[in-house]
């Protein structure tokens, strides 16, 4: 299937095929070391030459016009650093009034959201579940299972 990036007319795409054709962002333990609280474990793994792949993102750049919706596929691998599960870096949107939807294709975990006042909400993630991140909330995924 040919992926069409004709944003002005809409498009349909197969997730797996499109994800393989896009440039990926790879986040390893080296990239994520400050995100984990067990810095002794991070140092031990680094000293042993271990730099596991934590997650990968394949994203499509939407036009910069108002109302455009970008989307992508994130593969969050299973694993732990000390007692913490692998997680994404997390972020606020540059335009704070932007929402986001996550649709879980496989695996299980939690979508952690937090607003600027410190209100934290945990949203369960499982195959077939859609999770809505409200505008103004930072968010990160945590893989609590054994599958990506």
Residue ranges and their predicted role:
Residues 17-127, 144-148:
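Active-site region of the double-stranded beta-helix
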